[in-house]
């Protein structure tokens, strides 16, 4: 039996970048995991790793175009940086990012969130249980 995402759930996201190699290096440092390069039609992507099987949310970095551009406004994606928010924030800064919202505790059992500016000018959310 193949797992599928629940109906009406988010299944894909794209983070626009102006320099794919630079952004891939940044996100690999932030997450401590490699991104996979793929070419889909005319677009080259750097795909985020997943560990939740077919039902997990998938996404990528893609070169910006006339339709998209890096931005600190608009929809915000939150990436799981478990097990440690503190370690992830340190990696983000070391890789050239900047913290825009420091670590914030959520209600008991929900972990922590923070927000960063990536190396491309996007504001990205981070979430971790620790």
Regions found by a protein language model. Name each.
Residues 49, 62, 78:
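Residues in well-ordered beta-strands of folded domains
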Residues 56-63:
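A short, structured beta-strand/loop element
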Residues 7, 14-56, 107:
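Core segments of cupin and vicinal oxygen chelate
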Residues 23-27, 92, 121:
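Conserved active-site tyrosine of GNAT-family acetyltransferases
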Residues 27-30, 45-47, 76, 89, ...:
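Residue-level detection of beta-strand scaffold positions
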Residues 1-18, 36-39, 66-130:
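Vicinal oxygen chelate
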Residues 1-4, 65-69:
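Short, flexible, solvent-exposed loop/turn segments with mixed acidic/basic and small polar residues
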């Amino acid at each position: 039996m193949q797992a599928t995402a629940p109906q009406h759930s988010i299944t894909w996201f794209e983070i626009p970048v102006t320099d794919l190699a630079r952004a891939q290096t940044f996100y690999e440092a932030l997450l401590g995991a490699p991104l996979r390069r793929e070419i889909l039609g005319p677009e080259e992507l750097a795909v985020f790793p997943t560990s939740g099987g077919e039902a997990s949310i998938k996404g990528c970095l893609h070169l910006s175009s006339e339709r998209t551009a890096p931005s600190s406004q608009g929809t915000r994606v939150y990436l799981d940086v478990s097990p440690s928010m503190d370690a992830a924030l340190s990696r983000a800064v070391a890789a050239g990012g900047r913290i825009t919202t420091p670590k914030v505790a959520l209600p008991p059992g929900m972990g922590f969130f923070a927000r960063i500016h990536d190396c491309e000018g996007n504001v990205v959310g981070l979430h971790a249980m620790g």
